[in-house]
């Protein structure tokens, strides 16, 4: 397996992460990227994104509050990413509830590129054509067959797929990881999943093995959450502590403290 200095390599490059994301968590995504050691750019005007992607290190597309203008921008950005060899992370927020989002994902796969799909277990199982339990943008799924769903979807789109829940699952279609770190408090603040998607974009920007980089991003969020909860047991203070601990997280810490089963 490739050397696992994922965070170190990311911080050495300070990658520019182009985010087309939702209005609910745009500030959270920008702040967590800064704390992690990346440089966020929240550029979504459809007449600007093609050029901006060309100078970016990774593109993060979050479908949470998808407008028609964002859809146009996301597709154009993905075309630029394909033309300029920029990795793309897709977060299919709420796709079981709004089928149009699946059409957007398929369009991006057709004309652009997808390197990572990161969603909750319900979203990933839905995209894989499996029965899933969701409510709005939240997953109610118990995680059964989640790794199989990741594997099927990874083969379909030829990309990395990550499904988050009580346990987190990652697959590239052949290899996989199961991550057992985290805290329930991450479900009590809006945007934890969106922030994780941004971290996935940061870690994949300059790291070839994207199964490892995605696993590292999830470990970073989960372990920062565990440490934040040790000092802050209420949602407001926990959110602040989470950002602080992302700032301090290291490769040594995530691989030593991480509870990961490689498949």
From Swiss-Prot:
Substrate binds at residues 42, 191. It is an enzyme of class 2 (transferase). GO terms for biological process: thiamine biosynthetic process; thiamine diphosphate biosynthetic process. ATP binds at residues 118, 164. GO terms for molecular function: ATP binding; hydroxyethylthiazole kinase activity; magnesium ion binding. Its EC number is 2.7.1.50. Catalyzes the phosphorylation of the hydroxyl group of 4-methyl-5-beta-hydroxyethylthiazole (THZ). This is Hydroxyethylthiazole kinase 1. The gene is thiM1.
């Amino acid at each position: 397996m490739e050397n696992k200095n994922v965070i170190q390599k990311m911080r050495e490059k300070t990658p520019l992460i182009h985010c087309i994301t939702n209005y609910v968590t745009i500030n959270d995504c920008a702040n967590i990227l800064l704390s992690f050691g990346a440089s966020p750019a929240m550029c979504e005007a459809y007449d600007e994104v093609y050029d901006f992607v060309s100078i970016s290190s990774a593109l993060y597309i979050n479908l949470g509050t998808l407008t028609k203008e964002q859809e146009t921008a996301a597709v154009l950005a993905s075309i630029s990413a394909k033309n300029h060899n920029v990795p793309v992370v897709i977060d299919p927020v709420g796709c079981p509830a709004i089928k149009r989002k699946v059409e957007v994902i398929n369009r991006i796969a057709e004309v652009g590129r997808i390197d990572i799909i990161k969603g909750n277990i319900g979203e990933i199982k839905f995209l894989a054509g499996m029965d899933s339990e969701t409510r709005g943008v939240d997953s109610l799924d118990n995680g059964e067959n989640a790794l199989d769903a990741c594997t099927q979807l990874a083969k379909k789109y030829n990309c990395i797929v990550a499904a988050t829940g009580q346990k987190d699952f990652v697959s590239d279609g052949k290899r996989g990881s199961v991550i057992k770190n985290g805290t329930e408090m991450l479900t009590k603040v809006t945007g934890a999943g969106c922030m994780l998607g941004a971290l996935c974009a940061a870690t994949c920007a300059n790291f070839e093995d994207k199964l490892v980089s995605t696993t590292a991003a999830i470990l970073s969020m989960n372990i920062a959450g565990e440490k934040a909860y040790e000092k802050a047991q209420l949602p407001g203070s926990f959110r602040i502590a989470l950002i602080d601990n992302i700032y301090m997280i290291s490769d040594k810490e995530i691989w030593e403290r991480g509870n990961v089963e490689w498949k």
